[in-house]
Amino acid sequence: MGMVTATIIMHNGINTGAVFGHVFDFSAMPATAKALFALLMCVILTTAFAMIAGFFMARFKMHPFISTMANMLIIFGLVTYATKGVSFGAIDAAIPNMFIPQIGSFPTIILWAVVAIVVVWFIWNKTTFGKNLYAVGGNPEAAAVSGISVFKVTLGAFILAGILYGFGSWLECNRMVGSGSAAYGQGWDMDAIAACVVGGVSFTGGIGKISGVVTGVLIFTSLTYSLTILGIDTNLQFIFEGIIILAAVTLDCLKYVQKK
């Protein structure tokens, strides 16, 4: 959803706008204005949908897997319907160089990832919201008794996630110069969950560090590149990922049982 939005706004000419109607033609706007407006719209849309999933979890005690899966299906349906299932066009070629400039062979998009890591680390470790996040994740009943609003903290967690989704989709749109389809990014949710689990984030809640998540991402990225270099079939790579996830979750469950 975020990437489609960014492409609509930052597209070069009206090739993408033709799918949605000329009302979405932003070609007259300056490149910088288009890029910033696209970022704003990406964040607004992704945050809105994340809030919906968070609301159902916080208000009706719905399992997060169900609320987010339903959200994902709704978004996929909307994007597929809006784009008619066709790939959307390229964005203004000048825009990516503004925010992801080429410096030799160095992938400068990593710098944005570092900024996101620092911001999330600060929120988790240096703010009241971050401390409440761990408290609610570890034991929501005890957190509520101590005066913490479980509803607000849960919704806040989804809002933070939505903002990051929007910013990430905007960056990915820049990296891919707007080229993509409604199915773009499918499967990334499993990669993200796998990286978190391998990095020590507990499914039982209340446990996890940003350094662990970064480690998990590096492990899975290294695994993917290694298997590709070794010539392992792409379909077989999913088997290796599944085994790693199963092992990591099993260890997490064993730790939880031992604590009990």
Question: Whereabouts are the PLM-identified features?
Answer:
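Transmembrane alpha-helical segments in multi-pass inner-membrane proteins
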Residues: Y165, M176, G180-E241
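Transmembrane helix-bundle core of multi-pass membrane transporters
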Residues: V19-L36, F60, P64-T127, V153, ...
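Cytosolic-side transmembrane-helix boundaries in multi-pass membrane proteins
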Residues: V145-K152, L223-K260
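Membrane-embedded helix boundary and interhelical linker motif in transport proteins
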Residues: M1-I52
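Helix-loop-helix "hairpin" substructures at the membrane interface of multi-pass membrane proteins
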Residues: K34-C42, F49-A53, S105-G180
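Short loop segments and helix-boundary regions at transmembrane helix junctions
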Residues: I9-M10, M29, L45-A90, I123-T128, ...
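Loop-to-transmembrane alpha-helix initiation sites
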Residues: P64, F106-A113, T154, G187-D189, ...
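Hydrophobic core segments of alpha-helical transmembrane domains in multi-pass membrane transport
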Residues: G2-A6, C42-T46, M72-T80, W112-I123, ...
